[in-house]
């Protein structure tokens, strides 16, 4: 029989068509004047001159202009193509205006392309044209099919075939249902359609219009090769055979927003909009007989009909013939018939053509186990299973999130692979015979278009409805919620399936970045792999590629007709013969055998205490624990940071693979043969097995040597430590197995990859990499493992080099654009790279690589490093390691015999250690071994049960034997198979007795795999699991009873008990224990390397660090006494406080997250080789130094989330965690959320202490075990007792403001912050923080009720002291009279009354209170009464260098009035308020009221002011000759800061309307206006009521017996006349000693800060101008005000009113709002109106409204109206004085 012609030519226009139906349809539409007999088409070309219209149409093809479509914007190269395209947009009514063609009789052909399956070829999975377009991309048109001319027996002469079709055509009533069997009868096998019929007729027009082939250019070969893909996309490099395909593809790059004109849905490119517009096609010919819905495709109708109940009992079609819909043969029926013919090997079709009930299941054998959906092909089922891979799948291009893998795959096609399907031109492929039969078919009545809102599939849980069942199945996965975190990165997923899918992303990360230019000519290896038998024998790939091979097998006509395909009942793969199927089934039997063997393996006995995940081996559990080791881990090579240890390990592997890829590129570029490194087994992927259609790498790399092969698709070919352990895993096995098998597959693949990185080369050199692959001959291995650069075409290499012209000098990566290179350079920050073989350091990786060349292959370090598992230090030799253990940890129990045996074991282990490689991979492997401890030679060996560490295997074995012998009777040993040896598992219940000598790990215990076969991984773990279940925190402190999970945590905790007076010699700070001192060294690098002046106390029963030799005898006595007390304390009392943490070790939690240093301090600097050149701080690792250097990169670094500024990168990085890390730990009592669990635990202690404080005011003896031997006071912690210890230096630290003494300088500095912060707030005009409760006596605010009660107790003590001090025998007046003068009355109902009486100056030159003695004792007692406040500092007392003195102690000239004001002790520190100071009480009681100034008083020679301390005279800030005078206004100031603040250059914007004073800011003006308001209210109050003979005496008190309110008053006078500034002494500067602690000083105002960030924040206050708010039209005077104002818009309003629901940002505003709803009651009643007020400030403001109605007498005394008798008990207003405090608003 003759060969099949390549195509069918039209005799009129010389156009070519792939089959007869296309030709017949073309002649019917274009050449209606020609003969209609299809059998006379002889294929003889006719000239264009025979038909003038054809010649005119043909000439349009040569027009080279661009013709855009006005509807969709698509461009065409000629007018004919545009006209053909415009028919797709024309409505159906417009298409029928012409002569009655076949379109009228078959209207459904206008917009729906008939499937070519009716011609005997079923493509893809039988899903219509969409799946056919998918097959175009996957099989590359003709590549996957065989030569059409090869099947000589399947083709007949075309005219003969046409005649047969016409002769067998039935009448019009039969429709097309009976016509197809005539074509596909037994006598004539079905016509196999070439792959080119996938392109529609319109695309054929486009292809010929863009490129005009001449006769010499037309392809003559039947099979186009890869070289004919000459149409390349300029943006992404994708190539196509036809220009129309390229034009279609370019629409995917037209990015933008393209809304649908019907449903207004937006799309990112034109291709997506075009595909979507097909859903809105008006012509839906397929109607459902049960509901009014209609569909475009028959398969959609068939799927819809399955949703109706009772579908099987009904017969939707009237006739029993093959079901037809509007003249179309149902696609599913044709697919089933063709499938049947393919499986049975016969072309017979059912004569009845009925759609049986079970026909769907009969011809759809592949069923989904999850949803029950069935398919005809195994590949369709594999593709469908991806829809069940639920999770969150973000698109890497547009960041859209999809919820299953199938949706993501379809979504990515919209970006990169636009569908080149038919139906684009709206033309149907049908023969002339079909059209003729369709003309005789009666026209089907049109049914109204169905409603688009019909959603039959409804979710039972949430009620959401869907149109398709698959959408409902995908939606149901969203209800399976949970929290599954990836072990390699910090990402979390809502279900386990999403987590498994995410793990694959780590394995195939490079698949997304595959270079599109790597396509070339297929290699001989690939041609060899096209055989399914060879592929299955060599390697069983994932099911996606198996689907491709199956489609290739089914698309081969000769193979389908020659033999019956054999289907595997397990995986659904197809094979051409029974022999291939039997060969394939062997793999399943081996898998079943391996699963059977795995079921015999021991149970999962090792469970994680944190997440509950269980493992069979202890090593797997130890590796798994790394996922819970959260923190800030930095890579030493690129300074990248990670949240978990597992993520950093995964990152280190990436460096190793990148280096290998660059090394192989270099080798291939020089023409050398790249061989595998002998140092380890590699995880490689054969590209040929993965993608048969892809080509070799253009740089000459073999498939096993490229980066893509390392990670693509996660198909790991593992070359293990032994050849028989190389296991080939299939990707989809994780989804087909049960849950346990799935977890095992992921764990084994992950663990296999990690373990093989450290596998010695001599264990795998028997077979090498390729030797471990089964089913591969030597030639095949040689072709895979070696490559030759000359085998690649030169043009591909040229294209590669031309595309990548920009090369990175550091890593060698190439980029096509300069922008890509610039963005890539940020990945190579300057850092320190240390050689793993010598201590040399380099600035970049290229320098380190060149240095590696200097080391020889056999060069090894002098000795294997020894890692201390207690502190993490590494020692080069055993001697230094043992010396460190004896000195630092006290571990000296090793015997000489054990040492010798240990050395011999170490030497034996070192001989089997892998040789060092001359590559960067060895550096990374060394880093991995330090972190993971994969190689056990020379490292500590950790018992998996008890955590005890041994530095040799012999000691570990003896440990197991000793425990086994002592506990053999209690435990039954179980045998495990580990490396071929059975090992006994023993228990360890004698663990508590050896806790002290346990070598605790620092939380990083690792597995010791591959070291030897004598000790298995699961030693001591089965019985240890039961112990861990009963003791989840096995490491217990023997002093306080606190328990920990890890030994390293216990080691760090024990430093708290190493108490002592640790004084830093650099900054003179004192710390009570070693932990606090070490934390201080971290924060202050300048102090690092210095030893504390006083040695620490050795912990009882534990290890201690080296003592300082020089210790005082008295200090040793105190330390010994404390140690004895610690030993005497019973364990029960210590266990009661095990959860308490010493209150002095306040370590910043963010710094603990940043760096967890557990290393011991030692003088050996060589073990910390990385030193900072700025501050001298040293580190063990280069990554730590790189991380530290960020703290020196000072500048202005702003947070993008909250606009907060920072002074260095480290602060900004730590701050970003606040925004990034979720606050998942929430307090159940108050609802506050925290990022860390320990933060929540510390917060919950506050609630617990508050609950305890409500029940008992003081803790019991059991809760406070540490007692002072001198005074009997008890404490919770030893550090608090050490601070309390009374020593001779206890009184040398005194506060210059309030004369309070402290035992150490740290406590004094903490106390001085109370004074400095209040003064700084008053200087800057910033309002004070709102307090929760306030004292009614002095107005001080407190954060809690407990602080207020302590403060009121101080008032009570002060009252008693004053009463006892005035009861002396030398008092000038009686005690009762003095008590009345002072106004100190008894406390009633928690309220005290304090009245102040003023005396005029006495003739002696001293103004003396009638009750206060003029001696130092009286001064000291007055200090206990007085209050340090800047607002009251300008009355009664003077502040000289922080020393407050009374006016009776100051020598002033005659004629000046001075006043005296006493103050209450509101300034006392809460930390020191547990007990009063008895020293000054005694001096108060023993004071002589008649005595004058004592000799110890120090008077100023210029002004006569007296001081209690001599340093008060040395303060130059108040010296007369050092006064600072303004040159413009001659005003004097005490210090340069106040002078600098006072300036005349500020714009006159904020001026007071009363006194014309100019203020610098609006807040300062508002503060100033309050002074005027208070002055007026004082005057009105003074004129309202007076009591007693003195007009200056006033009392304000609440109504009712025994209640009153005090208000300080004084005589009017100018404060500057007394030498005190108007701001109340705010300009007083601190001594220079404190300047060292506040090194950051503002250049404009001189204000100093401890941190650079505080200075940066303060400098915003000086940026004066008009700063508009971006959210509201408000203008702010400076940046600081703008920042504070922006919080009103951004901060959430957490505090809501329970009555009206209004929300506020702060609790203080909510409290103020609550007064609106509260009844108008209070102690202050207005005498002119019935209003009452709770607070004095509100009452004074209200009185200001009445002041204009009051007459003022000529003498200045106000005449107040008479008050009613009921108001006589109300409080009187204070004496009018211009010195009323400006911040009276705080005295509520």
From Swiss-Prot:
One matching Pfam family: zf-C2H2
Residues modified to Phosphoserine: 601
Disulfide bond annotation, renumbered to this chain: none
Gene Ontology molecular-function annotations: zinc ion binding
Record-listed cross-link Glycyl lysine isopeptide (Lys-Gly) (interchain with G-Cter in SUMO2), residues: 443, 526, 548, 1127, 1138, 1148
Biological process (GO), any one: regulation of DNA-templated transcription
PROSITE patterns: ZINC_FINGER_C2H2_1, ZINC_FINGER_C2H2_2
Regions of compositional bias (Basic residues) in chain numbering: 651-664
Coiled-coil segments on the chain, per record: none
Polar residues composition-biased segments: 427-440, 962-972, 1406-1425
Keyword Lipid metabolism: no
Disordered: region residues: 28-48, 139-196, 306-360, 416-449, 509-531, 651-712, 889-916, 956-976, 1351-1386, 1398-1439, 1455-1489, 1579-1629, 1744-1788
Extent of Basic and acidic residues compositional bias: 28-38, 306-333, 1351-1360
Role this protein plays: May be involved in transcriptional regulation.
Family named by the database record: Belongs to the krueppel C2H2-type zinc-finger protein family.
PANTHER family membership: BLOODY FINGERS-RELATED, KRAB AND ZINC FINGER DOMAIN-CONTAINING
Protein name: Zinc finger protein 646
Protein's gene: Zfp646
């Amino acid at each position: 029989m003759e060969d099949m012609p390549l195509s069918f030519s039209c005799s009129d226009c010389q156009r070519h068509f792939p089959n007869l139906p296309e030709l017949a349809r073309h002649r019917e539409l274009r050449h209606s004047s020609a003969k209609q007999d299809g059998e006379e088409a002889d294929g003889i070309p006719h000239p264009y001159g025979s038909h003038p219209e054809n010649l005119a149409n043909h000439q349009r093809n040569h027009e080279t202009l661009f013709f855009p479509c006005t509807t969709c914007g698509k461009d065409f190269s000629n007018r004919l193509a545009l006209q053909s395209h415009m028919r797709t947009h024309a409505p159906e009514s417009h298409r029928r205006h012409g002569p009655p063609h076949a379109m009228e009789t078959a209207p459904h052909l206008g917009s729906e392309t008939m499937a070519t399956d009716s011609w005997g070829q079923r493509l893809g999975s039988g899903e219509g044209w969409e799946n056919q377009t998918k097959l175009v991309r996957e099989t590359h048109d003709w590549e996957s099919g065989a030569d059409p001319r090869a099947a000589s027996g399947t083709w007949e002469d075309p005219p003969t075939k046409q005649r047969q079709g016409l002769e067998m055509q039935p009448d019009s009533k039969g429709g097309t249902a009976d016509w197809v069997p005539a074509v596909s009868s037994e006598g004539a096998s079905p016509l196999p359609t070439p792959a080119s019929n996938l392109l529609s007729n319109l695309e054929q027009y486009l292809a010929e219009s863009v490129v005009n082939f001449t006769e010499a250019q037309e392809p003559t070969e039947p099979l186009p090769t890869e070289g004919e893909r000459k149409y390349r996309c300029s943006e992404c490099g994708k190539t196509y055979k036809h220009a129309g395909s390229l034009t279609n593809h370019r629409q995917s790059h037209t990015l933008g927003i393209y809304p649908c004109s019907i449903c207004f849905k937006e799309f990112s490119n034109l291709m997506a909009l075009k595909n979507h517009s097909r859903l809105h096609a008006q012509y839906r010919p397929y109607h459902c007989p049960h509901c009014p819905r209609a569909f475009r495709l028959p398969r959609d109708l068939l799927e819809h009909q399955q949703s109706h109940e009772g579908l099987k009992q009904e017969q939707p079609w009237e006739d029993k013939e093959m079901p037809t819909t509007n003249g179309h043969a149902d696609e599913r029926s044709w697919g089933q018939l063709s499938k049947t013919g393919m499986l049975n090997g016969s072309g017979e079709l059912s004569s009845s053509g009925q759609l049986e009930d079970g026909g769907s299941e009969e011809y759809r054998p592949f069923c989904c186990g999850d949803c029950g959906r069935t398919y005809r092909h195994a590949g369709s089922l594999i593709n469908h299973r991806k829809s069940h891979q639920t999770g969150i799948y973000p698109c890497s291009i547009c960041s859209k999130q999809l919820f299953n893998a199938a949706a993501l795959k379809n979504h990515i096609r919209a970006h990169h692979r636009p569908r080149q399907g038919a139906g684009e031109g709206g033309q149907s492929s049908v023969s002339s015979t079909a059209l003729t039969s369709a003309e005789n078919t009666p026209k089907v009545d049109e049914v109204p278009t169905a409603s688009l809102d019909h959603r039959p599939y409804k979710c039972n849980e949430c009620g959401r409805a869907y149109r398709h069942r698959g959408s409902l199945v995908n939606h149901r996965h969203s209800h399976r919620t949970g929290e599954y975190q990836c072990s390699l990165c910090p990402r979390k997923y809502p279900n386990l399936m999403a987590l498994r899918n995410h793990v694959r992303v780590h394995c195939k990360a490079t698949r997304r970045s595959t270079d599109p230019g790597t396509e070339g000519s297929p290699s001989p290896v690939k041609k060899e792999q096209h055989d399914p038998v060879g592929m299955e024998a060599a390697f069983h790939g994932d099911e996606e590629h198996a689907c491709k091979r199956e489609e290739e097998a089914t698309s081969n006509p000769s193979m389908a007709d020659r033999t019956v395909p054999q289907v595997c009942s397990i995986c659904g793969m197809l094979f051409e013969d029974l022999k291939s199927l039997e060969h394939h089934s062997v793999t399943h039997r081996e898998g079943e055998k391996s699963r059977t063997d795995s079921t015999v393996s021991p149970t999962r006995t090792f469970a994680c205490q944190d997440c509950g995940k269980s493992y069979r081996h202890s090593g797997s559990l130890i590796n798994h624990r790394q996922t819970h080791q959260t923190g800030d881990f930095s890579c030493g090579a690129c300074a990248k940071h990670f949240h978990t240890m597992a993520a950093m390990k995964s990152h280190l592997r990436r460096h190793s693979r990148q280096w290998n890829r660059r090394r192989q590129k270099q080798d291939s570029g020089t023409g050398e043969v790249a061989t595998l490194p002998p140092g380890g087994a590699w995880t490689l992927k054969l590209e040929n097995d993965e993608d048969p259609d892809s080509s070799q790498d253009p740089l000459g790399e073999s498939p096993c040597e490229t980066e893509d092969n390392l990670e693509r698709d996660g198909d790991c070919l593992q070359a293990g430590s032994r050849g028989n352990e190389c296991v080939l895993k299939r990707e989809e096995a994780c989804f087909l197995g049960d849950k346990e098998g799935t977890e095992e597959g992921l764990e084994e693949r992950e663990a296999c990859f990690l373990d093989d990185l450290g596998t010695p080369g001599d264990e795998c050199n028997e077979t090498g990499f390729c030797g471990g692959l089964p089913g591969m001959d030597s030639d095949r291995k040689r072709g895979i493992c070696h490559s030759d650069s000359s085998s690649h075409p030169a043009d591909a290499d040229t294209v590669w080099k031309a595309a990548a012209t920009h090369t990175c000098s550091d890593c060698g990566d190439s980029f096509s654009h300069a922008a890509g290179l610039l963005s890539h350079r940020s990945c190579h920050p300057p850092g320190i790279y240390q050689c793993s073989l010598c201590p040399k350091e380099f600035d970049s990786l290229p320098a380190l690589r060149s240095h590696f060349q200097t080391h020889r292959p056999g060069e090894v370090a002098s000795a294997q490093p020894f890692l201390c598992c207690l502190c993490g230090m590494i020692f080069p030799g055993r001697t230094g390691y043992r010396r460190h253990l004896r000195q630092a940890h006290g571990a000296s129990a090793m015997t000489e015999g054990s040492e010798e045996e240990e050395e011999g074991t170490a030497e034996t282990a070192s001989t089997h250690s892998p040789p060092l490689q001359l590559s960067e991979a060895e550096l990374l492997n060394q880093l991995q071994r330090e972190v993971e401890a994969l190689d056990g030679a020379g490292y500590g060996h950790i018992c998996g049960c008890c955590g005890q560490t041994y530095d040799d295997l012999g000691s570990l074995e003896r440990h197991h034997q000793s425990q086994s012998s002592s506990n053999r009777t209690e435990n039954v040993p179980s045998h495990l198979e580990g490396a071929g040896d059975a090992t006994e598992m023993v228990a360890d219940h004698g663990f508590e007795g050896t806790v002290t000598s346990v070598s605790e790990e620092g939380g990083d215990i690792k597995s010791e795999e591959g070291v030897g076969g004598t000790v298995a991984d699961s030693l001591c773990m089965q019985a240890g699991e039961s112990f861990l279940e009963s003791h989840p925190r096995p490491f217990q402190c023997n002093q306080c009873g606190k328990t920990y999970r890890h030994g390293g945590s216990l080691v760090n905790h024990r430093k708290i008990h190493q108490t002592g007076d640790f004084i830093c010699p650099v900054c003179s700070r004192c710390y009570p224990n070693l932990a606090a001192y070490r934390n201080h060294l971290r924060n202050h690098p300048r102090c690092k390397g210095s030893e504390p002046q006083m040695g620490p106390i050795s912990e009882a029963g534990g290890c201690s660090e080296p003592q300082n030799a020089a210790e005082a005898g008295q200090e040793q006595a105190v330390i010994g006494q404390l140690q004895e007390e610690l030993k005497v304390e019973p364990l029960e009392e210590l266990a009661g406080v095990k959860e308490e943490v010493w209150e002095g070790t306040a370590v910043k939690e963010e710094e603990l997250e940043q760096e967890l240093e557990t290393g011991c301090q030692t003088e050996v600097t060589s073990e910390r080789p990385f030193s900072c050149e700025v501050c001298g701080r040293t580190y063990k690792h280069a990554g730590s130094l790189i991380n530290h250097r960020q703290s020196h990169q000072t500048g202005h670094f702003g947070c993008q989330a909250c606009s907060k500024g920072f002074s260095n990168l480290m602060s900004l990085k730590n701050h970003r965690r606040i925004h990034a890390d979720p606050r998942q730990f929430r307090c159940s009592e108050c609802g506050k959320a925290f990022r860390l669990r320990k933060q929540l635990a510390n917060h919950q202690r506050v609630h617990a202490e508050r609950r305890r404080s409500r029940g008992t005011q003081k803790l019991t003896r059991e809760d406070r075990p540490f007692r002072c031997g001198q005074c009997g006071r008890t404490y919770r912690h030893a550090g608090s007792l050490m601070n309390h210890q009374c020593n001779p230096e206890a009184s040398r630290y005194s506060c210059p403001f309030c004369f309070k003494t402290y035992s150490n300088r740290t406590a004094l500095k903490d106390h001085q912050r109370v004074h400095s912060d209040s003064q700084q707030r008053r200087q800057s005009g910033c309002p004070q923080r709102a307090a929760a409760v306030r004292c009614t006596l002095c107005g001080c605010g407190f954060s809690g009720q407990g602080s207020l009660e302590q403060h009121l107790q101080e008032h009570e003590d002060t009252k008693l002291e004053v009463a006892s001090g005035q009861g002396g025998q030398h008092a000038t007046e009686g005690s009762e009279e003095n008590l009345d003068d002072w106004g100190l009355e008894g406390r009633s109902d928690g309220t005290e009354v304090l009245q102040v009486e003023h005396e005029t100056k006495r003739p002696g030159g001293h103004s003396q209170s009638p009750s206060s003695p003029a001696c130092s004792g009286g001064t000291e007692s007055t200090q206990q009464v007085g209050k340090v406040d800047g607002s009251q500092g300008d009355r009664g007392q003077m502040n000289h260098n922080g020393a407050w003195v009374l006016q009776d102690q100051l020598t002033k000239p005659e004629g000046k009035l001075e006043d005296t004001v006493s103050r209450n002790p509101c300034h006392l520190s809460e930390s020191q308020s547990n007990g009063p100071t008895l020293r000054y009480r005694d001096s108060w009681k023993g004071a002589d009221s008649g005595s004058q100034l004592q000799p110890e008083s120090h008077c100023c020679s210029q002004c006569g002011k007296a001081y209690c301390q001599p340093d008060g005279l040395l303060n130059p800030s108040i010296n007369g000759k050092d006064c600072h005078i303004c040159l413009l206004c001659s005003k004097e100031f005490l210090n340069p800061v106040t002078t600098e603040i006072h300036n005349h250059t500020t714009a006159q914007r904020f001026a007071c309307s009363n006194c014309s004073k100019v203020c610098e800011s609006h807040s300062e003006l508002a503060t100033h206006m309050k002074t005027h308001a208070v002055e007026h209210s004082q005057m009105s109050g003074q004129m309202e009521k007076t009591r007693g003979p003195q007009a200056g005496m006033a009392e304000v008190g609440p109504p009712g017996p025994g209640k009153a309110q005090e208000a300080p008053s004084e005589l009017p006078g100018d404060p500057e006349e007394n030498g005190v500034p108007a701001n109340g002494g705010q300009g007083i500067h601190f001594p220079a000693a404190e300047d060292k602690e506040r090194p950051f000083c503002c250049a404009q105002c001189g204000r100093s800060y401890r941190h650079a960030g505080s200075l940066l924040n303060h400098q915003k206050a000086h940026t004066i101008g008009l700063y508009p708010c971006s959210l509201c039209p408000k203008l702010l005077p400076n940046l600081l005000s703008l920042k504070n104002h922006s919080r009103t818009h951004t901060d959430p309003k957490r505090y809501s009113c329970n009555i009206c629901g209004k929300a506020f940002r702060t609790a203080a505003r909510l409290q103020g709002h609550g007064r609106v709803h509260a009844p108008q009651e209070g102690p202050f009643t207005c005498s002119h109106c019935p209003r009452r007020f709770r607070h004095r400030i509100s009452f004074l403001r209200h009185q200001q409204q009445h002041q204009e109605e009051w007459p003022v007498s000529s003498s200045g005394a106000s005449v107040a109206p008479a008050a009613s008798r009921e108001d006589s008990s109300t409080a009187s207003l204070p004496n009018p004085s211009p010195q009323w405090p400006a911040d009276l608003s705080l005295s509520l």
